[in-house]
């Protein structure tokens, strides 16, 4: 058994407080950009540790820097956790379920930790406690970075814009993790592309309005938008190789507000995902061709407005970091350390190591009760029977999930900072 595996199985650190913390975070979620209470809770927890705390960073971001031993001659490792919630109505029925209603874009919405960011925060604070108490096991610098506003893809860039690189030592390696559907406690990692890159595309079509009884006097943007939606479905199926991955989803389609008026404008908002730039460029050329072609075919007199926004970088795990950390995961978790499938979701985490010029590894943690997962797999009903991220009934199985998430965070950091790790060269 390696020294890391032995330490993490017998660390002797009391982490029983994690459950009450998790339930408090879960019951009191906050939307992206409004994480005042959560930030205060994190700061309160960090007060227990021997670390330098920097806050606020990029809004409500919090950074804790732990230095130990001959830290100037040993590596710097950063572990990140996000902590914002979602405008989702909770249906879990647990005593600590969120009942919060908060304003968003002019309307009141329910708020829930439907993506597990409460678990990410709890686990990273647990890793902080473990590494703070077991300073005999490591040397170097450990940075715990708590990031707000992941769900709107603004938090990482906000921290970067607020001088993140000048506030912390440059990490030799960065880590992050995410809970997902899967057997609770499983630690799933892979080299290379792990999460998709993404963009959103806002398309506005300006036609000509007319009374509903006189469609011949109009240039109907609703009809044009409908034709665009239909034609978009053929791009992935007919212009992208089956060996490649791409998604084009129409998430918003808006036009008019009266049943007897043909409107003057229609709006579509697309979400696109991919694993490489070659595919991205191909589908974007095709989208613009389809939009402009349908407008031309219908006699639209105005050039369509096509705007790209909410870009998410590809999460592309460094192969050397993976090769170093994965054997440690295998030894610490045994059969629960498995190879991850690529995840088609996207993250803003890569912006941080890219800005810091650091290699990184991002892995996932299974959060579904083991029995529920096994039954769903056996019945080929995972999509139907297993609650997934962003659903109102998504609730990680606490004990195995928090244990693996806390341990994985500490294991990855100790791979670089453990007392038997290599010095900087």
What are these regions (language model features)?
Residues 3, 14-21, 34, 38-45, ...:
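General structural feature for long, well-ordered alpha-helical segments within catalytic domains
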């Amino acid at each position: 058994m390696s020294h890391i595996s032995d330490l993490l199985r017998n660390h002797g650190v009391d982490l029983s407080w994690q459950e009450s913390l998790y339930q408090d975070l879960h019951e009191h979620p906050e939307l992206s950009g409004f994480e005042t209470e959560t930030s205060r809770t994190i700061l309160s927890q960090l007060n227990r540790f021997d670390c330098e705390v920097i806050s606020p960073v990029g809004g409500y971001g919090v950074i804790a820097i732990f230095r130990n031993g001959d830290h100037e001659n040993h590596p710097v490792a950063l572990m990140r956790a996000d902590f914002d919630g979602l405008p989702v109505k909770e249906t879990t029925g647990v005593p600590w379920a969120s009942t919060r209603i908060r304003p968003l874009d002019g309307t009141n919405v329910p708020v829930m930790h439907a993506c597990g960011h409460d678990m990410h925060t709890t686990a990273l604070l647990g890793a902080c406690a473990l590494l703070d108490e077991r300073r005999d096991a490591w040397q170097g610098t450990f940075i715990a970075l708590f990031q707000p506003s992941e769900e709107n893809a603004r938090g990482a860039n906000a921290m970067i814009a607020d001088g993140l690189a000048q506030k912390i030592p440059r990490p030799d390696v960065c880590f992050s993790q995410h809970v997902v559907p899967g057997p609770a406690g499983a630690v799933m990692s892979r080299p290379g592309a792990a999460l998709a890159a993404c963009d959103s595309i806002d398309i506005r079509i300006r036609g000509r309005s007319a009374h509903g009884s006189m469609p011949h006097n109009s240039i109907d943007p609703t009809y044009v938008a409908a034709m665009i939606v239909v034609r978009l479905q053929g791009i992935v199926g007919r212009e992208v190789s089956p060996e490649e991955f791409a998604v084009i989803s129409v998430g918003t389609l808006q036009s008019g507000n009266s049943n007897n008026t043909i409107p003057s404008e229609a709006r579509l908002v697309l979400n696109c995902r991919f694993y490489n730039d070659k595919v991205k460029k191909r589908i974007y050329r095709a989208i613009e061709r389809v939009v402009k072609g349908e407008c031309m075919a219908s006699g639209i007199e105005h050039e369509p407005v096509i705007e790209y926004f909410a870009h998410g970088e590809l999460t592309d795990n460094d192969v050397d970091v993976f090769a170093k950390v994965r054997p440690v995961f295998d030894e610490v978790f045994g059969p629960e350390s498995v190879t991850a499938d690529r995840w088609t979701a996207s993250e803003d985490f890569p912006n941080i190591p890219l800005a810091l010029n650091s290699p990184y590894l991002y892995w996932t943690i299974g959060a579904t009760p083991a029995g529920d997962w096994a039954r769903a797999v056996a019945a080929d009903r995972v999509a139907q029977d297993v609650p997934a991220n962003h659903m109102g009934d998504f609730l990680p199985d606490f004990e195995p999930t928090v244990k693996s998430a806390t341990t994985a965070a500490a294991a990855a950091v100790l791979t670089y900072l453990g007392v038997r790790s290599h010095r900087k060269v």
